[in-house]
C-alpha cells in the first residue's frame, strides 16, 4: 500500500500551526496577566518600602526634637524614643507580613495558572495527536485507532509477568465483583470479545468482564481486579510530546 505523503505532511503542518496558535493565543495572554500581577505586587512592595522610609524619617525627626529638650524633659525623651522604636518595629513587621502574604499569593497563583495551562495544553495536544494518529493509521492500514490500541493492550496482557498473573487470579477468586475494563473510548462488541478471549486465555478466568469509559486513561485501556491492574495508554508518549512542545516554544521565544 502506498503512503499518502501529502496527507502525512498536511497533518504535520496542521500540528505545527496548532503549536503556533497555542503560543499566540494561550501562552502570551497568560504571561501578560502574570506580568501585570507582578507589577501590581512590585507597586505594593514599593508602598511598603515608602511606609518604612517614612517611619524612619519620623524616628529621626523625633530624635532631633528630643535632643533639644534633653535637659528639661529626659523622661519625655525616653518615652518618645521608646514609642518611635515600637512604631518602627510595628511598621516593619507589618511590611514584612504584607510582603510574605503577597509572595505566597503570587506563588499560589502562578502554580495554579501553570497547572491549569498544562492541563489545557495536554488536552489540546492529546486531541490533535489522536486525530492525526487516527487518520494516519487509516491511510496506512485501513484500521482504526481504537482497534490498534486494543491490539497493543491484548499484547500487553499476553506478556504479563507470571507473578502478576497469579496475583490477578487470586484477586478474582477472592472478589465477587467481575473484573473491570476501563477505556478512554467506547469499545465495540468485537473488541470486547477479543479482550474477553485474551483475558480468559491468559488468566484462566471464566467470568464476564465489565466495560466502562473513563477520561483519566488518556488514550488507553486498563484491566483491574481487586486492587491489581494491567494497563496501557499513550500517557508516556504524550508526556514526551508535551516536553518537546515546551522546548519548542521556549526556543521560539
From Swiss-Prot:
Lipid bilayer topology: Single-pass membrane protein
Superkingdom classification of source: Bacteria
GO MF term (any one): proton-transporting ATP synthase activity, rotational mechanism
Statement: the UniProt record of this protein carries the keyword Transport: yes
Pfam families, A to Z: ATP-synt_B
Transmembrane segments: 2-22
Compartments, as annotated in UniProt: Cell inner membrane
Keyword Plastid in annotation: no
Keywords: ATP synthesis, Cell inner membrane, Cell membrane, CF(0), Hydrogen ion transport, Ion transport, Membrane, Transmembrane, Transmembrane helix, Transport
Gene Ontology cellular-component annotations: plasma membrane; proton-transporting ATP synthase complex
Coiled coil regions in record: none
Complexes and interactors: F-type ATPases have 2 components, F(1) - the catalytic core - and F(0) - the membrane proton channel. F(1) has five subunits: alpha(3), beta(3), gamma(1), delta(1), epsilon(1). F(0) has four main subunits: a(1), b(2) and c(10-14). The alpha and beta chains form an alternating ring which encloses part of the gamma chain. F(1) is attached to F(0) by a central stalk formed by the gamma and epsilon chains, while a peripheral stalk is formed by the delta and b chains.
PANTHER family from the UniProt entry: ATP SYNTHASE SUBUNIT B', CHLOROPLASTIC
Biological function: F(1)F(0) ATP synthase produces ATP from ADP in the presence of a proton or sodium gradient. F-type ATPases consist of two structural domains, F(1) containing the extramembraneous catalytic core and F(0) containing the membrane proton channel, linked together by a central stalk and a peripheral stalk. During catalysis, ATP synthesis in the catalytic domain of F(1) is coupled via a rotary mechanism of the central stalk subunits to proton translocation.
UniProt family annotation: Belongs to the ATPase B chain family.
Name used for this protein in its record: ATP synthase subunit b 1
Native source species: Prosthecochloris aestuarii (strain DSM 271 / SK 413)
Origin organism lineage: Bacteria, Pseudomonadati, Chlorobiota, Chlorobiia, Chlorobiales
Amino acid at each position: 500500500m502506498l503512503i499518502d505523503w501529502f496527507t502525512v505532511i498536511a497533518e504535520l503542518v496542521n500540528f505545527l500551526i496548532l503549536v503556533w496558535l497555542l503560543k499566540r493565543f494561550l501562552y502570551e495572554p497568560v504571561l501578560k496577566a502574570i506580568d501585570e500581577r507582578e507589577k501590581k505586587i512590585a507597586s505594593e512592595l514599593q508602598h511598603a518600602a515608602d511606609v518604612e522610609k517614612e517611619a524612619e524619617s519620623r524616628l529621626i525627626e523625633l530624635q532631633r526634637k528630643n535632643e533639644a529638650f534633653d535637659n528639661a524633659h529626659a523622661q519625655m525623651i525616653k518615652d518618645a524614643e521608646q514609642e518611635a522604636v515600637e512604631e518602627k518595629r510595628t511598621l516593619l513587621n507589618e511590611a514584612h507580613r504584607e510582603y510574605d502574604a503577597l509572595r505566597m499569593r503570587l506563588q499560589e497563583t502562578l502554580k495554579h495558572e501553570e497547572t491549569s495551562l498544562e492541563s489545557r495544553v495536554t488536552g489540546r495536544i492529546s486531541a490533535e495527536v489522536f486525530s492525526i494518529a487516527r487518520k494516519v493509521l487509516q491511510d496506512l492500514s485501513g484500521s482504526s485507532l481504537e482497534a490498534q490500541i486494543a491490539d497493543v493492550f491484548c499484547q500487553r496482557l499476553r506478556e504479563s509477568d507470571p507473578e502478576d498473573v497469579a496475583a490477578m487470579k487470586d484477586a478474582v477468586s477472592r472478589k465477587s465483583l467481575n473484573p473491570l475494563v476501563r477505556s478512554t473510548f467506547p469499545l465495540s462488541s468485537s473488541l470486547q470479545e477479543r479482550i474477553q478471549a485474551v483475558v480468559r486465555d491468559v488468566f484462566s478466568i471464566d467470568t464476564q468482564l465489565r466495560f466502562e469509559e473513563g477520561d483519566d486513561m488518556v488514550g488507553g485501556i486498563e484491566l483491574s481486579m481487586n486492587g491489581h491492574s494491567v494497563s496501557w495508554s499513550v500517557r508516556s508518549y504524550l508526556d514526551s510530546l508535551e516536553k518537546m512542545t515546551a522546548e519548542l516554544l521556549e526556543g521560539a521565544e
